Amino acid sequence: MKVARFQKIPNVENETMIPVLTSKRASELAVSEVAGLLQADLQNGLNKSEVSHRRAFHGWNEFDISEDEPLWKKYISQFKNPLIMLLLASAVISILMRQFDDAVSITVAIVIVVTVAFVQEYRSEKSLEELSKLVPPECHCVREGKLEHTLARDLVPGDTVCLSVGDRVPADLRLFEAVDLSVDESSLTGETAPCSKVTAPQPAANGDLASRSNIAFMGTLVRCGKAKGIVIGTGENSEFGEVFKMMQAEEAPKTPLQKSMDLLGKQLSFYSFGIIGIIMLVGWLLGKDILEMFTISVSLAVAAIPEGLPIVVTVTLALGVMRMVKKRAIVKKLPIVETLGCCNVICSDKTGTLTKNEMTVTHILTSDGLHAEVTGVGYNQFGEVIVDGDVVHGFYNPAVSRIVEAGCVCNDAVIRNNTLMGKPTEGALIALAMKMGLDGLQQDYIRKAEYPFSSEQKWMAVKCVHRTQQDRPEICFMKGAYEQVIKYCTTYNSKGQTLALTQQQRDLYQQEKARMGSAGLRVLALASGPELGQLTFLGLVGIIDPPRTGVKEAVTTLIASGVSIKMITGDSQETAIAIASRLGLYSKTSQSVSGEEVDTMEVQHLSQIVPKVAVFYRASPRHKMKIIKSLQKNGAVVAMTGDGVNDAVALKAADIGVAMGQTGTDVCKEAADMILVDDDFQTIMSAIEEGKGIYNNIKNFVRFQLSTSIAALTLISLATLMNFPNPLNAMQILWINIIMDGPPAQSLGVEPVDKDVIRKPPRNWKDSILTKNLILKILVSSIIIVCGTLFVFWRELRDNVITPRDTTMTFTCFVFFDMFNALSSRSQTKSVFEIGLCSNKMFCYAVLGSIMGQLLVIYFPPLQKVFQTESLSILDLLFLLGLTSSVCIVSEIIKKVERSREKVQKNAGSASSSFLEV
């Protein structure tokens, strides 16, 4: 069987362009051969001009998604709605019966209704498309000798890419460096066990992807270790291309709220069709024109059935999510918007979320008891190390220098141009070395082996040899949590001598560590020696990570509103409690629990004590799962933050998984429901506030739409049963439907968030959106609209002859009622004057547009013919405005009564329940 060496994309401009190597062929070749074929420099990478040249040939590293259905087809598909088809049938029947005016009127109305529905659906799709672009994949790439953080779509064949734990592989890579590398290829091969990766060429195999152990495939996840690889295939030329096309066919599931709206719509449709059928039957029995009754009934079905409700819900949720982006929170899944308002427990990591994650070493304790203070902040060389009033530099003080050496060599971070590339804790140690002029030590050693840091073991170690002394034995350097590092130490350094580590010394170091921790410092221990288990303890460094600005205020606000906050950290008990107390999380009645204690507890026992626990210290991601389960067992809705690979399972288990945008791994971001762009705890509060506001807005337009639907249905039903002439014709009913489903309704979905909403207790997730209180308000509004409209119709019918003026007055009365009803629906608790008449500009424009449209329908001759209206006097309009404002006035009175009652209850000592009382 003949195997092609590579796939080559034709290009008339340049026949010598770099090929795209297949993963099968690349796995069989040596690294040098692959680099030669791709004309790549493994160490320095490509230069910018070469990248541009290759991109022009190969394109971006992304997939060509099949083109969307043309807009005209989407528009035509709107006519497939059964109700629209029935209206078209009535228009055809009107033509056959030579009632051309009616046919034209119905057709114009259909076009308007279909256009509004099309625009709504288009907005919904576009909003959801925008959401998918909020989290672009990124990677680390070497170009022109520098490590760069760039978008994955920028990669071209021949690029050198660096991988670390938690990264998603950005393109197909031929690996040339791999340290303890393990990759999860389940998204590609279906195999759940991570695959170990190597760099050696692989013999020709049967084409099985799993056998290509020197290839990292695009879209797979790095579970362990780190590596470097050369890009051999991008976009559709990667092995993931076909898988991606299949993924595109999957439809996103509907949110619970959308499902409930669908169910509500179906229930209303069922009842509406029943009532409309009765109206047709009664009208026919009373001798009314059957075609007229059919057209009115179908029009009423279009208006009364809130088919646009799920679409408006989607648009509101999507627009709300886009607003959250401005507040630095990316919500990946729409259901989370609903869940945010129910959240009553937040489990937050300390570092980078509650604190700034700007690590700076401020204190050093050597193993022989010497204390050193460190000045300066940030990832730079500005600052000094002071011992007993003297500035130490270089190897002036061996005890301090050995600590700095260990911290510098056992380190993967790089500081370039005052910019950190790596972990903040490691950056603090490099900055310390820079202050002493010892940062070059990192390059003086050749790393032979590495034991990467993990949240489980809480230490990192490297085995090295000095470049100038490679014939000497290897030396190990270790850094990590004191409790773990001290286990590997048998001796300690004392004034240049190596002495046996006694229990007395261990107790002394433990006391110093506790003292530094109680001052809010993160404490790291450092050691070195010939091998693990025979290390010499060198000392401790204290690293400060100050609380973020505004976090304390956010914590206070959330706790007051009934949201319990738990801090989860890998730090010591002293450090954790010191920071928690400073933030207002920890009080005299609070408890703290260690990760080890969580391990020994059953979920049942943990669920009993967890309400009083404010701090979980020395905790790792595996403990988070148990904490979540214990909280959920008590009925809590839990938000959990995370940034590491091991956090992914906990984030999926939480009701709201929150990933860190800056420090979070790709695995973590993928598992999360929400991403904090700036890793700031305050952003969680802003998201909860926005989530509550969005839910309130949905309630507002549900109230508006249902009250209008019920009023329209009731009005025609009563008129038919009372043997009145029809108060509204088909075109007028369709116009009302446009107002009900159109701009005024949608503008209620973008009402600015009430600043007081964050102080309200979390909503019970089991509560229906249609509460008793909301149903009462819907019915009150519907009754007022029906009674007012029937009164106007009866008043105009006193001559017992129905005229265009009669229906125009009735029609305009209903529309004006709708506008005032929309105004009162802007808030369920506050007066329209309190929230501001013009605070929602979109609402003002929507209502103004609707009123202008109504005036055109009344006064513009061509539209008068379509809607069968006639001009009204200014006195008529003033009369209607006075009457229809009653729906808003009554609503305001109800709100006032509710607020007064709530105030009385508060004064009586009634308190909202919260999870803290569970």
From Swiss-Prot:
GO biological process: actin cytoskeleton organization; calcium ion transport; calcium-dependent cell-cell adhesion via plasma membrane cell adhesion molecules; epidermis development; Golgi calcium ion homeostasis; Golgi calcium ion transport; intracellular calcium ion homeostasis; intracellular manganese ion homeostasis
Tissue specificity as recorded in UniProt: Expressed in hippocampal neurons in the CA3 region of the Amon's horn (at protein level). Expressed in brain, heart, lung, stomach, liver, colon and mammary gland.
EC number assigned by the record: 7.2.2.10
TM regions (residue ranges): 79-95, 100-121, 263-282, 295-316, 700-722, 728-751, 776-794, 802-827, 843-862, 876-892
Active site per the UniProt annotation: 349 (4-aspartylphosphate intermediate)
PANTHER family hit by this protein: CALCIUM-TRANSPORTING ATPASE
Record's protein name: Calcium-transporting ATPase type 2C member 1
Name of the gene this protein is made from: Atp2c1
